[in-house]
Amino acid sequence: MMSSKVQERDLIVSKIKDGIVIDHIPAGRALIVLRVLKLKGGEGRVALVMNADSRRLGRKDIVKIEGKELSNDELNLVSLIAPTATINIIRDYSVIKKFQVKLPETVKGVVKCRNPKCITNQPREDAVPTFRVLHLDQPILQCQYCGTYLTIDDINAQLTGER
């Protein structure tokens, strides 16, 4: 067991009373997580730690959001950006629930197919972009309609508005 001095030394950001901690985000992706959750800082206290040491990942990012709970849709977005993420639900400064995000089997209406000829990109069609999730560690999505693949870079770019 660690001494309290070691624990205090390792505590980079103060504890939050109520909210969530998104831990084990791959290094460099915390800002993307904030963007897809549409958090700008005015919602309450948001703490961000980037490139922290991690036994599991080598380096990781951490996001703490006070007064926030994630919907299932938001959890799915986080899982696309950070499939290794762990969610900690905090109440009265204690972790009451902890779980790893899980990629859904299909992703519907979140990202667009990058194939311009796909039926989902045709203005006269009412097809909603739907993808099968193929790889769980580094998500690769396959369009249900045309078979085009989206990589993690494609997903990140679309979710952050960079494409």
Swiss-Prot record:
Binds 1 zinc ion per subunit. It comes from the Archaea. GO terms for cellular component: aspartate carbamoyltransferase complex. Zn(2+) binds at residues 113, 118, 143, 146. GO terms for molecular function: metal ion binding. Keywords: Metal-binding, Pyrimidine biosynthesis, Zinc. PANTHER family: ASPARTATE CARBAMOYLTRANSFERASE REGULATORY CHAIN. Involved in allosteric regulation of aspartate carbamoyltransferase. This is Aspartate carbamoyltransferase regulatory chain. It comes from Caldivirga maquilingensis (strain ATCC 700844 / DSM 13496 / JCM 10307 / IC-167). The lineage of its organism: Archaea, Thermoproteota, Thermoprotei, Thermoproteales, Thermoproteaceae.
